[in-house]
């Protein structure tokens, strides 16, 4: 915990601190190395590695950035329409892709809209709510969902993609509808 608190002062990435802590725990821990390696959630780690590779490719090839450009073309710069498009597009994409590259792509877009005089506060909220709540729609939409699936399966209670989708997607849609109503009342 101290390492994470001091990583900025120490100029060490938090991933290095986490890895160092894991190695220390492995060395001083009472569990055998083999048991520890067997307890690692390898399918989840491999899944996220592959997901970040695919999403990274989409970012590098400009697919996500082109999608953001399409959103701007569709809305014509109208603030309320832009807010709703950002909310719904970020929710739907976050249900199927990792939301971090999408959010990272949308940040400069929203900043440039602010530079042009548009009130960006509603757009930040739309992006945040859409990206966060959209992850509830599918099993791969959020890291926690994938971890849940792995742990659940390991304990004899597998959750399939379709089982999760039947519950998660309607809940996501209801959440985004409620967010839309709130944001229209608050910002329109």
Question: Could you describe each region identified by the protein language model?
Answer:
Residues 41, 56-157:
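Membrane-interfacial helix-loop connectors
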Residues 44, 49, 99, 158-161:
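Generic intrinsically disordered, low-complexity segments enriched for polar/acidic and small residues
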Residues 150-174:
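Interfacial loop-to-transmembrane junctions
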């Amino acid at each position: 915990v101290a390492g994470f608190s001091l990583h900025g002062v120490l100029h060490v990435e938090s991933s290095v601190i986490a890895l160092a802590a894991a190695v220390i725990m492995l060395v001083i821990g009472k569990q055998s190395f083999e048991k520890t390696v067997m307890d690692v959630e390898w399918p989840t780690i491999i899944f996220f590695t592959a997901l970040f590779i695919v999403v990274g490719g989409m970012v590098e090839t400009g697919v996500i950035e082109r999608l953001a450009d399409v959103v701007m073309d569709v809305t014509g710069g109208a603030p309320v329409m832009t807010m709703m498009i950002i909310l719904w597009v970020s929710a739907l994409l976050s249900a199927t892709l990792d939301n971090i590259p999408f959010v990272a792509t949308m940040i400069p877009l929203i900043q440039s809209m602010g530079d042009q005089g548009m009130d960006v506060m509603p757009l930040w909220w739309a992006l945040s709510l859409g990206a966060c709540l959209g992850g509830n729609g599918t099993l791969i939409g959020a890291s926690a969902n994938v971890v849940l699936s792995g742990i659940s399966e390991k304990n004899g209670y597998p959750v399939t993609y379709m089982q999760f989708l039947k519950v998660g997607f309607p809940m996501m849609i209801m959440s985004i509808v409620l967010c839309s109503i709130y944001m229209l009342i608050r910002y329109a």
